[in-house]
Amino acid sequence: MNPLDTFFLDQARAKELDDPTATLCVFITKESGDYPTGRTLVLRNIDGQLGVFINKSSPKWNQKDQGISLQTYWPSVEIQYRIKASCATLDPNLIRHSWKQRPETPQKLDWFYETVKPQSANLEPKEAINLATKLKELILPDQSEVPDLAAGLLLEPFEFEKLELRAGDLPHNRDKFVLVEGNWRHYSMVP
């Protein structure tokens, strides 16, 4: 059994129930002091694989090589996933195509990261106050041009952990799937 198939089925159920968190994940990396750090990102289904779009100016871009984890929780179906994965850079053609479909504000932010300040940089108080105005005034280049720092990652999971919460007297159900020599090995776990 491929746990990615189960993941997508559970996610589809959450979407059917209009769960606002169905497309979100917490993308977890390690900072320089080995502290875990997480940020909520949109988790995408890219041709049956997991992917995220991020900006190369983000600290996450450099931290990804130390390994990443994802966590999702969908309250509508009471299911949590923890996923460990390695990453591969998404095809730049896919980035170009997808980037053009983004709303204007995220596009402007990508250009802001490219031309003004990188993502996660500290702002002086005056800069913070004027950020919304500065973004509004930012003129986007020709639509065929995509910032060099716009990027994405294809996630290559090697471990899934699924927790199904259960009400009443039933214990929660917890399973782990580990990729071993190209095959998924299943383990039932104590919840």
Predicted feature residues:
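Charged, gly/pro-rich active-site loop segments
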Residues: 80-191
